[in-house]
């Protein structure tokens, strides 16, 4: 048994743990009933561990928003210490623990979920499918990386070529995201996630904003948009006055449900010239916070930890199971 200390921290959750010879969850802000349910869930997992070298988890909770994040943290500890490959899979408002195509345990929210919702799976098996309302493979790749870590399968509009384009006629990020998610969900009968993301530059009064994708005109490309942005800021020499934020609004829509909305910002500055080969959109000209690094210099996993989209998806994952269960 290692002496390694594990830690996970974001704005909603903070866990510190280590492996011991017993199971213990303690701390602030966690209901006793939640702790008992998680302990009962994981006791079944612990029962399959090596009894000659017993391993248990000792986790202190500083802050906590949902069972999903806490269960994922503990399972990650168990996997690293025992070389197991247990997966945490959100499904129809529940949380499934699976390994090698076997279902090990199920966490149910308070009040349970309807059997019709739980067993309404596709021929591909358990696990929620998210249809991303975009044909942009770069954006889809980011979402696939993020959702894949949480057990979701991702499709995009390229899988549904018959669907019409949804005009983004809104004047806010939320209006546009709602238009896409709710329209496509109504047409397909599927759960749909749409994002409206953009770059807000303070010196330009928040532009390009909702017009980020077409900032340089009807035939806009990433290169043209970046060139126009740098031209607009050509006479702004002080980096502090070139402050900007990438913004994402995510909307999840499903038939007969109220839509779920989350938002996040990624602060930084606009560079004087592009740099980096990764990412897409305005990444080459966006300096990340005070780091001096351009977003296009980050590897995908680094960007997912920091970016507006990564932050928004993590917020979404925190509230998503309760949203599913409440409206199922």
UniProtKB/Swiss-Prot annotation:
Family matches, as Pfam families: Ham1p_like
Cofactor-binding details, from the entry: Binds 1 Mg(2+) ion per subunit.
GO biological process terms on file: nucleotide metabolic process; purine nucleoside triphosphate catabolic process
Residues that bind Mg(2+): 196
GO molecular function: dITP diphosphatase activity; ITP diphosphatase activity; metal ion binding; nucleotide binding; ribonucleoside triphosphate phosphatase activity; XTP diphosphatase activity
CDD domains: HAM1
Cofactor annotation: Mg(2+)
EC annotation from Swiss-Prot or TrEMBL: 3.6.1.66
Record-annotated membrane-spanning stretches: none
InterPro entries: dITP/XTP_pyrophosphatase, ITPase-like_fam, RdgB/HAM1
Reactions catalysed: XTP + H2O = XMP + diphosphate + H(+); dITP + H2O = dIMP + diphosphate + H(+); ITP + H2O = IMP + diphosphate + H(+)
Active-site residues from the entry: 196
Homology family: Belongs to the HAM1 NTPase family.
Quaternary structure and partners: Homodimer.
Function (record text): Pyrophosphatase that catalyzes the hydrolysis of nucleoside triphosphates to their monophosphate derivatives, with a high preference for the non-canonical purine nucleotides XTP (xanthosine triphosphate), dITP (deoxyinosine triphosphate) and ITP. Seems to function as a house-cleaning enzyme that removes non-canonical purine nucleotides from the nucleotide pool, thus preventing their incorporation into DNA/RNA and avoiding chromosomal lesions.
Name this polypeptide is given: dITP/XTP pyrophosphatase
Lineage of the species this protein comes from: Bacteria, Bacillati, Bacillota, Bacilli, Lactobacillales
């Amino acid at each position: 048994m290692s002496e390694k200390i594990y830690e996970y921290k974001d704005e909603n959750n903070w866990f510190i743990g280590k492996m011991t010879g017993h199971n213990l969850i303690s701390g602030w802000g966690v209901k006793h009933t939640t702790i008992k349910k998680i302990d009962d869930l994981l006791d079944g997992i612990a029962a399959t561990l090596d009894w000659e070298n017993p391993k248990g988890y000792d986790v202190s909770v500083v802050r906590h928003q949902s069972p999903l994040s806490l269960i994922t943290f503990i399972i990650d500890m168990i996997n690293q210490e025992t070389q197991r490959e247990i997966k945490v899979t959100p499904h129809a408002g529940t949380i499934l623990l699976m390994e090698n195509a076997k279902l090990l345990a199920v966490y149910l929210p308070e009040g349970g979920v309807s059997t019709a919702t739980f067993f309404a799976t596709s021929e591909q098996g358990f696990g929620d499918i998210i249809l991303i309302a975009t044909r942009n493979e770069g954006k889809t790749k980011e979402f696939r990386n993020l959702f894949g870590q949480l057990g979701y399968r991702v499709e995009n509009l390229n899988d549904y070529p018959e669907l019409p384009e949804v005009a983004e006629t809104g004047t806010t990020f939320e209006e546009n995201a709602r238009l896409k998610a709710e329209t496509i969900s109504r047409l397909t009968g599927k759960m749909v996630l749409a994002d409206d993301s953009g770059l807000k530059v303070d010196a330009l009064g928040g532009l390009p904003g909702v017009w980020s994708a077409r900032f340089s005109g009807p035939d806009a490309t990433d290169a043209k948009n970046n060139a126009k942005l740098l031209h607009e800021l050509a006479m702004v020499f002080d980096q502090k006055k070139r402050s900007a934020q990438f913004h994402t609004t995510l909307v999840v829509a499903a038939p007969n449900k109220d839509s779920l909305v989350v938002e996040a910002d990624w602060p930084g500055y606009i560079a004087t010239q592009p740099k980096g080969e990764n990412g897409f959109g305005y990444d080459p000209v966006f300096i990340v916070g005070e780091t001096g690094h351009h977003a296009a210099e980050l590897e995908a996993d680094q960007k997912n930890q920091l970016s507006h989209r990564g932050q928004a998806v993590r917020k979404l994952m925190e509230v998503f199971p309760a949203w599913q269960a409440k409206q199922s």
